[in-house]
Amino acid sequence: MSGKIQLLVAFLLTSACLIYCTKYVTVFYGVPVWKNASIPLFCATKNRDTWGTIQCLPDNDDYQEIPLNVTEAFDAWDNIVTEQAVEDVWNLFETSIKPCVKLTPLCVTMNCNASTESAVATTSPSGPDMINDTDPCIQLNNCSGLREEDMVECQFNMTGLELDKKKQYSETWYSKDVVCESDNSTDRKRCYMNHCNTSVITESCDKHYWDAMRFRYCAPPGFVLLRCNDTNYSGFEPNCSKVVASTCTRMMETQPSTWLGFNGTRAENRTYIYWHGRDNRTIISLNKYYNLTILCRRPENKTVVPITLMSGRRFHSQKIINKKPRQAWCRFKGEWREAMQEVKQTLVKHPRYKGTNDTNKINFTAPEKDSDPEVAYMWTNCRGEFLYCNMTWFLNWVENKTGQQHNYVPCHIEQIINTWHKVGKNVYLPPREGELSCESTVTSIIANIDVDGDNRTNITFSAEVAELYRLELGDYKLVEVTPIGFAPTAEKRYSSAPGRHKRGVLVLGFLGFLTTAGAAMGAASLTLSAQSRTLFRGIVQQQQQLLDVVKRQQEMLRLTVWGTKNLQARVTAIEKYLADQARLNSWGCAFRQVCHTTVPWVNDTLTPEWNNMTWQEWEHKIRFLEANISESLEQAQIQQEKNMYELQKLNSWDVFGNWFDLTSWIKYIQYGVMIVVGIVALRIVIYVVQMLSRLRKGYRPVFSSPPGYIQQIHIHKDWEQPDREETEEDVGNDVGSRSWPWPIEYIHFLIRLLIRLLTRLYNSCRDLLSRLYLILQPLRDWLRLKAAYLQYGCEWIQEAFQALARVTRETLTSAGRSLWGALGRIGRGILAVPRRIRQGAEIALL
């Protein structure tokens, strides 16, 4: 008996587990989950009057940041935001400065004299090594060490206005713009332009300024920018714990330069270093406390005069009216030595640094002089002109080295510029006339950290212009919000159509649904309705803003990179939302926040911790299952639609009028016709087989016409009286064996064959059913036995419950009676107190 009870209990537990322990896939829409993205960003700015930012969105500084309780990886170098910034700034720079593109080589031999620089010019005039704003040499442009530009006077012959005659030209050039053959025998040399292998300007080009442009990047709807808010972030952090989400970045500076970064937006009251995760490339943000600035100036003593080579063609040379022009120069202001010392101290504390801790053995050094000019010299742009500054005096000053020290450096303006983003050269117009000056705040240093074998460290200035924008935006990363999530639950989809309930409208920001990113999955799931509506409302709002901008500036879309980016951002957002809704619709979950399905969960060992796990962590664990889950959901939805279609067809018979609809019976009529055609075809096959078998035995076909017809099956009839015209002799013996006509005989033959066929089918079905009965009889007995066990177990459980109820009832009754008696005695005792007092008083008085 105990074995039966154990079997019954095991059966009940197994059934309950199969019913209640099965998990089904549940689709959640609006979960705070994201993945890395690489789509174009668009810009927003306050100053939309400049040429490069006229198509940006108007910036109102209303970009809130939502703190997220998550951990995320950040890398300033492997970053789509910084890569887009580098590409876009280069395109704006290239288009704004406008290098001339109509170029023709001009390689003529010129006879040039030696340098016109006098001995007085080569010796530095006396004066202080350090200058300030009140020093008189600033206005006179004759500070100690500055000199005139090296010039050469050249003559060359070219065809002039008269094409059949040569004309001699005499021009003055910068000595750095010509290459001469080494010949010490005479004072005159054979020289060529140093860009003879490149090109020179043959037509007039417009001269443009490089406008100071500041803008911020914004993500399209459906995408978010995450920022690492950790103060110890150094450009590469696999586990940043202080993450905030925003739709736009901070303002970024676009001025390109080498060695130093100007007017950056990341300067703080501290020095910090962004270090590449795999090599020694760094970008150092300087402490703004030291007020580091640079003031560049070109004296007003140059005049550019074009040379007319032939009719309709002009060559813009460096035609110098003043044969001894002063150099351009840049002056550094601020506490540079203290700032550089703080850089060394910050480097020593950096976790990536492996060199010496002695700051006296850490030096700022310049790159090799045989490098490109942009590498060997500090290169920057001042009012559209490209300055190349020799930083030797500056390095001697900040390092207090032996040699000439100044807080200013000489510079030179060039026309042939190596491109900083792509391999190539651009040729620009000569400098404009008049004095040029520009002042910038120095906010960063581009450098490589080189640790030597003799326990010394060199901070070598670098020409990686792209590092400036990695410092500006390196703490951001672009992610795509994927609001669709899967999780196992015990609820199974109910197949009837769900009713739609009206909900109140919640006005939240676009990033409102991300506020639950760090919360547990269970808590986040409670707000999915509001989150999904917030997501959609934010997409629509940003779409409208983008559309307004595109409409206002549709005539200028061809001018900058922003026009196409605005259009692409709008299209991307619409495509993303439609793609999400298409996926939900393919699973039967369109416009639902929580959608239960009939698909079983594929991995019972993989279940979420609803109270301790975030949706982002859960998505990382099940990412490898998403493809299979999506396919299973689609198959389940297809099967569901088929079932609903068949059910709707059956429901059509509920209406009595549909029974008289001929279209409802056409299918069954077709089935009947097909059955008749099948029987006829089967009979034809049987007849052909029998005919062939009889031909093999020597019989003729039964349908042979007389007199070839031979009666095979005789139908005997009774004897008849002969006619009066006939005699008995005429009748003969044929009267007793008269046969039916052959068509009737053939019909009888077919009937007998059909009866034989039906009999055989009946016998076969009877044998099959009998064998099936014999096979299923043991199963029936086994099921009957198990049913008896189950019935006995149910009766036993019922009796146990009845006994338990009876005992409980008796116990409660007895307890109630006892309690009632106790309460009665207590009540009677309380009521007897006055009587006892009276009796006691009477006894005392007696």
Curated annotation (Swiss-Prot):
UniProtKB keywords: AIDS, Apoptosis, Clathrin-mediated endocytosis of virus by host, Cleavage on pair of basic residues, Coiled coil, Disulfide bond, Fusion of virus membrane with host endosomal membrane, Fusion of virus membrane with host membrane, Glycoprotein, Host cell membrane, Host endosome, Host membrane, Host-virus interaction, Inhibition of host innate immune response by virus, Inhibition of host tetherin by virus, Lipoprotein, Membrane, Palmitate, Signal, Transmembrane, Transmembrane helix, Viral attachment to host cell, Viral envelope protein, Viral immunoevasion, Viral penetration into host cytoplasm, Virion, Virus endocytosis by host, Virus entry into host cell
Segments for region (V1): 112-153
Glycan attachment residues as annotated in the record: 36, 69, 113, 132, 142, 157, 184, 197, 229, 232, 239, 263, 269, 280, 291, 301, 357, 363, 390, 400, 455, 458, 603, 612, 628
Pfam families referenced in this protein's UniProt entry, alphabetically: GP120 (PF00516), GP41 (PF00517)
Coiled-coil region: 616-643
Region annotation (V4) ranges: 389-411
Further facts: Some HIV-2 isolates have been described that can infect cells independently of CD4, using CXCR4 as primary receptor. These isolates may have an exposed coreceptor binding site.
Name by which UniProt lists this protein: Envelope glycoprotein gp160
Species this protein is from: Human immunodeficiency virus type 2 subtype A (isolate SBLISY) (HIV-2)
Gene: env
